[in-house]
Amino acid sequence: MIKWPWKANHTAALAPLPWEAALAIPLLAGLSDEQQQKLVRLSERFLQQKRLVPLQGFELDELKSARIALLFCLPVLELGLEWLDGFHEVLIYPAPFVVDDEWEDDIGLVHNQRVVQSGQSWQQGPIILNWLDIQDSFDASGFNLIIHEVAHKLDMRNGDRASGIPLIALREVAGWEHDLHAAMENIQDEIDLVGESAASIDAYAATDPAECFAVLSEYFFSAPELFAPRFPSLWQRFCHFYGQDPLLRLRLRETPALSDGGQVH
């Protein structure tokens, strides 16, 4: 039985939230009791430091707030909450939102167009999300909007823009870059063969290194059984960077407990 220390020792600055209910999603099912408690402590601090801002009539309740915080803190469970410095607000739309996008083509002409976005993040600025896609981030499908945007934030700690190479030791950069680009090429080869819609990894990962890191971070936490065997070298680099092994958690969860001479209970 899990002992929930926040039930008796919550801070006055933050009312107790329904953490047990918030933890009851497939994405977090493999966490040990100790990991769950650590994640909740980080999430409490996250909600004390960041402001969740509902937009366009979206109603934010305690359970939604708790689950959003848990997903933000899962990638930094071992890195530490300071890795999420650099922003103070999370803006939440009820559904994907329209933004004005400006881009420059190959000959230098600047174009403007309105595009639909699921989420956005900048180095210094808020993270923007939408609730419809957040809800789809609770399972173990390989899609996770919050982890995707958090990965961009972690990536940008290494410079002014996301590059696909997070803040790692200099001696590891060349190997990381090699393995990441190899993964991009592999994903693109599959897209060329079967098409974007049939690809086993989100085709967005093949667009550039920053998106590859963000997309594969989604798979790292929510579909490790797809990531690890396909890109074993890059998987080990992700495990080392995040300080976690979601595939091991998945295997432990799926392995029946044996005791009393091998009898399954």
Swiss-Prot record:
Gene Ontology terms for molecular function: aminopeptidase activity; metallopeptidase activity; zinc ion binding
Which top-level group of life is the source organism from?
A: Bacteria
The Swiss-Prot or TrEMBL record lists the needed cofactor(s) as: Zn(2+)
Assigned keywords, A-Z:
Aminopeptidase, Cytoplasm, Hydrolase, Metal-binding, Metalloprotease, Protease, Zinc
Which Pfam families is this protein grouped with? Peptidase_M90 (PF06167)
The record's subcellular locations are: Cytoplasm
Q: Which GO terms describe its biological process?
A: proteolysis
Q: What is its EC number?
A: 3.4.11.-
InterPro entries, A to Z:
MetalloPept_cat_dom_sf, MtfA_enterob, MtfA_fam, MtfA_N
User: What is the cofactor note?
Assistant: Binds 1 zinc ion per subunit.
List positions binding Zn(2+).
Answer: H111, H148, H152, E211
Q: Answer yes or no on keyword Cytoplasm.
A: yes
This protein's record includes keyword Cytoplasm: yes
- Cellular component GO terms, alphabetical: cytosol
Question: Could you describe the subunit structure of this protein?
Answer: Interacts with Mlc.
- What job does this protein perform? Involved in the modulation of the activity of the glucose-phosphotransferase system (glucose-PTS). Interacts with the transcriptional repressor Mlc, preventing its interaction with DNA and leading to the modulation of expression of genes regulated by Mlc, including ptsG, which encodes the PTS system glucose-specific EIICB component.
Q: Which family does it belong to?
A: Belongs to the MtfA family.
This chain belongs to which protein, by name? Mlc titration factor A
